[in-house]
Amino acid sequence: MDFLNYPEPLADLITGLSRLPGIGPKTAGRLAFYLLQQPQVAENLAETMIRAQREIRQCSLCCNYTDHDPCPICTGEKRERTLLCIVEQPRDVVSLEKTREFKGLYHVLHGVISPLEGVGPEQLTISKLLGRLEGVQEVVMAMNPTVEGEATALYLSRLLKPLGIKVTRIAHGLPVGGDLEYADEITIARALEGRRQI
């Protein structure tokens, strides 16, 4: 998008907004003009972003985002401390918590192993993970079913199995209400692998 006719601060705002995931130049332009027309909304948004940037940090135990360290999940008295779920991103913890099914602890990797993007195990929080395994009996791998997610799960399972820890993987398969006819072969194969007795 050509920003030459815009004043520099407006062009910079559009450029900044377009750097956000899922926001293209046209949407960024619409958002920028909206924010200019709604100064109170813009001011509140700016204050909220600055506050979040200032107050949110990684939990020293699980690496999830929190405003208390350690986070409420890690300090929760009703949590099953022998069960640890490894996820890619903090938003994955939110998704799993919404189900109210998982009662253990979490560990957030903040990414996956991706050699093409220059991300190796040392760029993830694996060293912190290895330092908190005392008393853990089972680790649940909850990475996304991507090539990188699978590679990360395999890498971690090779590290954890020699320690005598049971390593499991969440099942992947058909969504509720999904039709077999529209599912790809990998999804159907995973659904068959993850089948259980009824």
UniProtKB/Swiss-Prot annotation:
The keyword Transcription does not apply. GO terms for biological process: DNA recombination; DNA repair. It comes from Desulfitobacterium hafniense (strain Y51). HAMAP family: RecR (MF_00017). Belongs to the RecR family. Transmembrane segments: none annotated. May play a role in DNA repair. It seems to be involved in an RecBC-independent recombinational process of DNA repair. It may act with RecF and RecO. The keyword Protease does not apply. PROSITE patterns: TOPRIM. InterPro entries: DNA_Rcmb_RecR (IPR000093), Rcmb_RecR (IPR023627), Rcmb_RecR_Znf (IPR015967), TOPRIM_dom (IPR006171), TOPRIM_RecR (IPR034137). It comes from the Bacteria. Keywords: DNA damage, DNA recombination, DNA repair, Metal-binding, Zinc, Zinc-finger. A zinc finger (C4-type) spans 59-74. The gene is recR. GO terms for molecular function: DNA binding; zinc ion binding. Residues 82-175 form the Toprim domain. It holds the Pfam family Toprim_4. This is Recombination protein RecR.
